[in-house]
Amino acid sequence: MKANLPTARYEVPRLSEEAGAPVVFTLRALPYGRVQELKRLTEEADIRILLAGCVDPDLKAAALQEKFQGVTPAETIKAMLLPGEIADLSIAVEKLSGYRRTTIEEVKNG
């Protein structure tokens, strides 16, 4: 049985300030196998993870690609976000997927 994958919304303050309105990404956790597959493709892994986990905005939308002059969704991300923002959003997807946080507890002797 496939577990329901958690989602969360993250605002990018720099883009919100430029747009004069909140710019929010809705992200979804990825299953273990998908995260591992994307990490094996080490070149631009952060961008691949963000593309796979971003629910909204639709990074494949022609209007968004046109606005940021990106021919591909990956190019759109690079034009839209700073490198640190890409990394932070990618980390957020990993955290939603159970990575980069403590998901276990130490068993005390006794």
Enumerate the language-model features and the residues they cover.
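Short, surface-exposed, charged amphipathic helix/loop patches that serve as local interaction elements
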Residues: 14-110
